[in-house]
Amino acid sequence: MAAVLYALYRRPPDPAGFLDHYRSVHAPLAADLPGLVAFSHAPVAQSILGRGEWFYLARMRFADREALSAALASPEGSLAARDLARFARDLVELFVVDDD
């Protein structure tokens, strides 16, 4: 069963700075994760229900949870995790979804 990692980001204090860093630094690091089957990311266009705090969403698909775990434990995963902690530690929620 495929495993999908979602990263959902709250609105940052500096949206333009966030987008610049995400697109030029973080997305390339995430794209280098071993075993990554598909990767997409985009700004949240509209909040239908809730407080409207969500700003950006990333979706990373892996063959299964083992592949996801291996990717996160890899050197590339460590680089991406360190970068995430630097620029979005207090902004991000991470979720894993099993997807057939």
What are these regions (language model features)?
Residues 1-100:
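Macromolecular interaction modules
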